[in-house]
Regions:
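Acidic/polar loop patches that form or flank catalytic/metal-binding clefts of enzymes
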Residues: 209, 276-280, 409-412, 436-439
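Thiamine diphosphate
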Residues: 108-111, 116-229, 233, 427, ...
Length: 445
């Protein structure tokens, strides 16, 4: 059945790109084998995409959106075949790069590398939430964060920043699946990259496995091992871009252009599919994949039942995290005072922190200068002050995910001139309309 589900994902993706006459078929087809297995591991409820204790699935390469939409449709999210047929069309629910307006999309990842830092942010948020809410009897938060990434993501500098922080904090709830197909737009990755990725991630504090990304047994074993890790986990999956696309398989030509109707028909025939049927999903495949709906509904119901055993203090804290109330903040009065704006802002954010449990954040190693230390609030993962190190870009993207997590309102702080290092992340925060505060000081502000 894995093969049949995988081929269904392949040809849904190819059909979407072909009908739109634009898009990226290569990555979805190369990752379909892994996706068909991962679907069995993910804890989620398609009927309630906002269930707090769901696993988070991040697609750092947003161009592989056809894979995202195939997964969401097959799993039973509020997405129809007609939506898939409207791929990349104006005002459709299936835009070229996934947006958070589509149910089941955790975060809009934007430029390459953002999604890796977003995944680290989700994992950090999860760890802090677990420390706040879990007790010996009840695991309010115990989910995983999965992230698909590719060669391009790992070449981007933000991935180094974010993964170094993930390794430092031993984020054992983070699983990164690296689609290692050695292909970029210009050709082979050998044109500009020969890094030992395994050694790099081990040096950053990850556990690393290397698998054949088209061997179902190896995929299943690697994913099952994720539950036993004490560190973040990188799965290097050696894959072929556009697997199953005949002569375009394993070529850069399959990355960002339709495969052509004639080739798709031949590929379908080769795989035992009817070459004349488009957007075809067999009943047995849908029966298998839509089991996620009933399973997820039951898992969430059991989770809700378990919350009844929480203490009244924990229940109150959970409610305040879910519903931050800034009206309770007692803002300081600066009448008659001459203060630098960073000093007055420091007093304001401390007033917010005392009244709003969900408010947290940090600076890129400039908290004493930015005046952004939250007094008497502790240090992450047990407190609100997050030490990001000198990692502006990762900081902002990590906080984007913390803002999307559902429990926290973060801030990112640095000197104004260093905003250049995080503009892509700030742009994504604006596009998603996130509750993410950016604090910039010095440099004539």
């Amino acid at each position: 059945m894995n093969t049949k589900i995988s081929n269904t994902i392949k040809f849904l993706s190819a059909d979407m790109v072909q009908k739109a006459n634009s898009g990226h078929p290569g990555a979805p087809m190369g990752l379909s084998d892994i996706m068909s297995v991962l679907m069995k591991f993910i804890k989620h409820n398609p009927k309630n995409p906002k269930w707090l204790n769901r696993d988070r699935l991040v697609f750092s390469g947003g161009h592989a959106s056809a894979l995202v939409y195939s997964y969401l449709y097959l799993s039973g999210y509020d997405l129809s075949l007609d939506d898939l047929k409207n791929f990349r069309q104006l005002h459709s629910r299936t835009p070229g790069h996934p947006e958070i307006t589509t149910n089941g999309v955790e975060i809009a990842t934007g430029p390459l590398g953002q999604g890796i830092a977003n995944a680290v942010g989700f994992a950090l948020a999860s760890k802090y939430a677990a420390n706040l809410l879990n007790d010996e009897k009840t695991k309010v938060i115990d989910h995983k964060v999965y992230c698909f990434c590719g060669d391009g993501d790992l070449e981007e500098g933000i991935s180094y920043e974010a993964c170094a922080l993930a390794g430092f904090h031993k984020l054992d709830n983070l699983v990164i699946i690296y689609d290692s197909n050695n292909i970029t737009i210009e050709g082979s990755t050998n044109l500009a990259w020969n890094e030992d990725v395994k050694a790099r991630f081990e040096a950053q504090g990850f556990e690393v496995a290397r698998i054949d990304g088209h061997d179902f047994t190896q995929i299943e074993f690697a994913l099952s091992e994720a539950k036993n890790k004490t560190k973040p986990y990188l799965i290097i999956a050696n894959t072929k871009i556009a697997k199953g696309a005949l002569e375009l398989e394993n070529t850069s030509k399959s990355h960002g252009a339709p495969l052509g109707e004639e080739l798709i028909q031949r590929a379908k025939k080769e795989a035992g599919f009817d070459p004349d049927k488009h957007f075809f999903v067999s009943e047995d495949v849908l029966f298998q994949t839509r089991a996620a709906v009933e399973k997820g509904d039951l898992e969430e119901a059991l989770w809700k039942k378990s919350l009844e055993s929480l203490t009244s203090e924990k229940k109150e804290l959970l409610n305040s995290l879910l519903n931050p109330d800034f009206s309770k903040v007692e803002y300081p009065d600066f009448s008659g005072q001459k203060l630098a704006t960073r000093d007055s802002n420091g007093k304001i954010i401390n007033a917010i922190s005392k009244a709003v449990p969900s408010f947290l954040g940090g600076s890129a190693d400039l908290a004493p200068s930015n005046k952004t230390t939250l007094n008497d609030a502790g240090t992450f993962p047990d407190g609100k002050n997050i030490h990001f190190g000198i990692r502006e870009h990762a900081m902002a993207a990590i906080n984007n995910a913390i803002a999307r997590y559902g429990l926290f309102v973060p801030f990112s702080a640095t000197f104004f001139i260093f905003s250049d290092y995080l503009k892509n992340s700030a742009r994504m925060a604006a596009l998603m309309k996130l509750k993410h505060f950016f604090i910039f000081t010095h440099d004539s502000i």
